[in-house]
């Protein structure tokens, strides 16, 4: 046992007492040391790991259990950017993954509840408003843009109440999930009511979030993951995607040619906006597969679409330093035999030796340029009015999470009336704010507040005329009925499970495979060629698609999950003799599709060059005549 004056002793047991006990798997002594509370449970060792990270990487289950029970943060990342859960999955220890997943979801619920008072205060102080957020997806592959979905989020904010309407819910079972839904957040003094209104089924799922008095054991019991959730993680690659913005820079876009260039401005929904370009934005996707069996590795490779293989994304494959093939064996932790003295010595270089199982890592990096349209005279405030809403939506929506990560950067002055940011490796999202307070198009239950323009007696009293001035758009009144359960709807006491928040690679695959325009129903499986040409699905299903298990967080104690909606069965797979024919047809379809894309892109560039040359010739002639 470490003595009381351990901190005064030299060596790792004095500098890093918790890490030292974890290293030697002395969980009983670790329990006593943590209970004493004299050492920071989130202390970092010389390799950038917390005690919990080290316990997880080494596969020391009981040490991890002690640290989690005393509040160690599951969400912390190590120096390499991996979370505790991702490291747990890489150990292939089912019990450890189940334990970490349980505490991760528990801590998410606790943080969610703890953040409600601050959110309520921000909503209370902010001015009431209505705004529409239009999401459009674009791509550098011209024809891919035509199959991407679009949606308009309608946002009402009144006092401590918030409502968001949407039709694009997410992705599940290889289909875009469409539906007419409203999400209502109604703040109260000591609690908050969250409602999900399903207008298609005329059902309201209601949940009350108490701000105090939550029983820890009940929350932990509700956070217990199912065996399917754990197995789905152990049989799938560990994937993390992040926007690297440490070198990002914003510059004003220019317009004109030669010596007549000026800073570019555009009108966006009636507001004059300065156009900025953001450079040095990198989208980095890292995939780890050392925990997968050869069978599951084969499935992962088979699930890679021809289009994903075709894309010119820089790939760097990392493996052991000797370059030999890694066999999937249940090797014990710390295979390079790193000693405690070597590990805890900050001056000792470990080189390529790593803790835990030998890592198999694939890194994909692609540089993007983002664009911003900023209006300095816009009535809305990004920090006070819009940011709290994006924070709330980002909890369960991957797209809003990407948007939040971007707007938290130090942007140039002004409100971003339009933003274009990378979401996946070939897809950008363009978000446009418009119809503020119903000034462009009438909106039911929204009207100008006293002092602003009031509709005439013969007009619709529930909306503001589209001819309203900018000044009249600065304030509005919103009907309280918007934040109540609609009449005639069935109200259920527990909210059903939300649509799973899929990994980015899932979203990319689904975006390519599904046509949401006129290419059949949303449940049809389409080939790449059918998706790119927006034609009716053929008879061959996509043989490389795989189903992703539900990885959504378990419900809180108040929830009673509803049975999931029935999903149509997939079409039968083709016979053994037809598989090679299917893959050959995909390669041919892909080649033709990319040729068409390249031709369309080249034609667009040719027209731009021709226009620039014509304009330059006219300018030269005008100067000659003078």
UniProtKB/Swiss-Prot annotation:
GO terms (BP aspect): negative regulation of receptor internalization
Keyword vocabulary terms for this entry: Acetylation, ANK repeat, Cell membrane, Endosome, Membrane, Repeat
ANK repeats by residue range: 47-76, 80-109
Keyword Metal-binding: no
Modified sites of kind N-acetylmethionine: 1
GO molecular function list: ubiquitin-modified protein reader activity
Signal peptide, first to last residue: none
Source domain of life: Eukaryota
Gene3D superfamilies in alphabetical order: Ankyrin repeat-containing domain
Biased composition (Low complexity): 448-470
Gene Ontology, cellular component aspect: cytoplasm; early endosome; late endosome; perinuclear region of cytoplasm; plasma membrane
Binding partners and assembly: Interacts with EGFR (ubiquitinated); the interaction is direct and may regulate EGFR internalization.
Protein name listed in UniProt: Ankyrin repeat domain-containing protein 13B
Source species of the chain: Mus musculus
């Amino acid at each position: 046992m470490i003595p009381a004056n351990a901190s005064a002793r030299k060596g790792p047991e004095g500098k890093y007492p918790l890490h030292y006990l974890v290293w030697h798997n002395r969980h009983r002594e670790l329990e006593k040391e943590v209970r004493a509370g004299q050492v920071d449970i989130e202390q970092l060792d010389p390799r950038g790991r917390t005690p919990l990270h080290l316990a997880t990487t080494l596969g020391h289950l009981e040490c991890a259990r002690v640290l989690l029970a005393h509040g160690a943060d599951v969400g912390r990342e190590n120096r390499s950017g991996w979370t505790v859960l991702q490291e747990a999955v890489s150990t292939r220890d089912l019990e450890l993954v189940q334990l970490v997943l349980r505490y991760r979801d528990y801590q998410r619920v606790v943080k969610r509840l703890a953040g409600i008072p601050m959110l309520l205060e921000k909503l209370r102080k902010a001015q009431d408003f209505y705004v529409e957020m239009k999401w459009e997806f674009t791509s550098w592959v011209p024809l891919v843009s035509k199959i991407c979905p679009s949606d308009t989020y309608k946002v009402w904010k009144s006092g401590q109440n918030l409502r968001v309407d949407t039709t694009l819910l997410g992705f599940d079972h290889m289909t875009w999930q469409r539906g007419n839904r409203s999400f209502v957040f109604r703040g109260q003094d000591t609690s908050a009511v969250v409602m999900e209104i399903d207008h298609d089924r005329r059902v309201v799922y209601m949940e009350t979030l108490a701000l105090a008095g939550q029983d820890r054991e009940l929350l932990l019991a509700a956070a217990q993951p199912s065996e399917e959730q754990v197995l789905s993680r152990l049989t799938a690659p560990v994937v993390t995607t992040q926007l690297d913005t440490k070198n990002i820079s914003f510059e004003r876009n220019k317009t004109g040619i030669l010596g007549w260039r000026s800073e570019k401005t555009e009108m966006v929904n009636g507001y004059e906006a300065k156009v900025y370009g953001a450079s040095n934005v990198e989208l980095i996707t890292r995939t780890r597969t050392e925990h997968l069996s050869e069978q599951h590795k084969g499935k992962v490779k088979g699930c890679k679409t021809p289009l994903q293989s075709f894309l010119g994304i820089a790939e760097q494959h990392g493996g052991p330093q000797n370059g030999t093939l890694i066999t999937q064996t249940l090797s014990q932790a710390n295979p390079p035999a790193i000693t405690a003295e070597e590990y805890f010595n900050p001056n000792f270089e470990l080189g390529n030796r790593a803790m835990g199982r030998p890592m198999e890592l694939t890194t994909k990096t692609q540089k993007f340029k983002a664009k911003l349209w900023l209006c300095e005279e816009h009535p809305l405030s990004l920090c006070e009015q819009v940011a709290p809403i994006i924070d709330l939506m980002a909890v369960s929506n991957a797209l809003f999470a990407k948007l939040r990560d971007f707007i938290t950067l130090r942007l140039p002055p002004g409100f971003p009336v339009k933003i274009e940011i990378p979401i996946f490796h070939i897809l950008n999202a363009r978000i446009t704010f418009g119809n503020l307070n119903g000034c462009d198009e009438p909106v039911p239950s929204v009207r100008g507040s006293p002092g602003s323009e009031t509709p005439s007696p013969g007009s619709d009293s529930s909306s503001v005329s589209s001819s309203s001035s900018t000044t009249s758009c600065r304030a509005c009144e919103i009907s309280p009925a918007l934040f109540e359960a609609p009449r005639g709807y069935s109200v259920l006491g527990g909210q059903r499970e939300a649509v799973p928040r899929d990994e980015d690679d899932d979203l990319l695959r689904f975006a390519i495979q599904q046509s949401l325009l006129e290419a059949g129903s949303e449940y049809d499986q389409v080939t790449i060629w059918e998706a790119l040409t927006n034609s009716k699905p053929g008879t061959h299903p996509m043989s490389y698609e795989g189903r992703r298990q539900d990885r959504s967080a378990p419900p809180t104690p108040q929830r009673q999950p509803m049975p999931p909606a029935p999903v149509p069965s997939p079409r039968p797979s083709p016979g053994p003799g037809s598989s090679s024919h299917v893959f050959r047809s995909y390669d041919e379809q892909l080649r033709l599709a990319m040729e068409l894309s390249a031709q369309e892109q080249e034609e667009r560039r040719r027209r731009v060059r021709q226009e620039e040359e014509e304009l330059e010739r006219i300018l030269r002639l005008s100067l000659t005549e003078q």
